[in-house]
Amino acid sequence: RKQYDQQYINAVYQRAVSSRKTPIKDTTYFYDTIYTLPVVFHILYNNNAENINDSLLKNQLEVLNQDFRRLNADTSKTRAIFKSRAGDTRINFELATVDPNGNATTGIVRKSTSRTTFYSNDLNLVKYSSNGGADAWDPTKYLNIWVCDLSYLGQDALLGFAYPPYGHPFWTSQSWVSDPNQGVVLHYKIVGRNNPLSKGQAQVLDNSSKGRVAVHEVGHYLGLRHIWGDGTTGGGCAVDDYIFDTPNQRVRSDFDCNPNANTCNDPGAEQFPDMIENYMDYSAHFCQNMFTHQQIAAMRYSLSVYRTSLPVKVEYIQKMKVKDTFAYNDLKLFAAEGQKVIVEQRNSDLPNEMYMDVYDMSGQLVLDHYQLTKNEMWVSTAKMAAGIYVFSLRDKENRPVLRQKILITKN
């Protein structure tokens, strides 16, 4: 790994992580945010099979939201060695409700085309109505997703593709494209979970039947590379994805999801298997289930630097105004015996009730709005795994009282 790249991604990661812990300078809110991106589906069809129904598109959106928020049902399949590296991106997706002309829309646009396939030397033909495709809605305002036939000579040649943000340092300039081509393109047979056109079909389709091609391609759209860094056999371990919590991997994974694969075995370092669970691998969908924390930091960094014009909805998780900090004297938290975190109070003027939120270091909410009273001013940590947590104490007026990191240990 080049030193410059190492310094760069460290800076990106630290910026994203530290911004979850401290207020941004000159703003009133903490920066722990949830982004929601507006999506428009462009359906290009030459026959009825290609004109997939709304339910599949809405299901695809559901898959995006579940996988990006780590709400997918198969998180339990993340192997123990990687569980601490998996996290919630805090990025949501919703169908656009207003079109570029200001009119109401369902976020789904359909167009008949004379083209039997959009697989060609110029894959971007699908993005132009003059070539039988559909013009993008302003790519600085919408996440455009085109759904079309990407077959070649009757074979399912390509399942999807996307481009990274223009100028993104993880990619060479050959990978950058101008704004009209920004967005995601999907083969119609792999849209949604259990699409009948892919489930039980040829291996490449059956192993891609959980709607995660879209998850993978949106990862590219937000700047992520394949976890093997697009290296090849013989030199792949020296090629990097610029993400430090994805283990080095020589080549893409096979569909067999081999949990014992370790294609970059370094005898002098800690051993990690290939991360077949990662959405940015080519492993079968049934073993994919995670993004890593540094992948998350990189995607959120792309939204804050390279895709700033997207009109994302922003939800401030903490909803804590810095200027309204309401301090109580001699108040602190500490971990005590009996698996508790106790609020130590020496001020008789404390309110009769307070509320506690607890976050783990990935930003996930562990305990939500737990009520404390003067007779029971403590929180149980019995169900919390060992680690560092952020305890956020508020009064009944929702004013922040105290915010403190505490290390929870287990005997």
Give, region by region, the residue ranges found by the protein language model:
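Active-site-proximal segment of zinc-dependent metalloprotease catalytic domains
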Residues: 121-226
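Short strand-edge motifs at loop-to-beta-strand transitions and within beta-strands
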Residues: 375-379
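A recurrent domain-boundary module in secreted/ectodomain proteins
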Residues: 288-326
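Propeptide-to-catalytic entry region of secreted or membrane-anchored zinc metalloproteases
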Residues: 1-139, 148-149
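The catalytic-center signature of Zn2+-dependent metalloproteases
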Residues: 192, 199-289
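Residue-level detector of functionally pivotal "anchor" positions at catalytic/ligand-binding pockets or at interdomain
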Residues: 312-342, 346-349, 409-410
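Short, glycine-anchored, charge-dense loop/turn motifs used at functional sites
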Residues: 358-366, 389
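C-terminal tail/sorting-segment detector
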Residues: 343-345, 368-370, 386-411
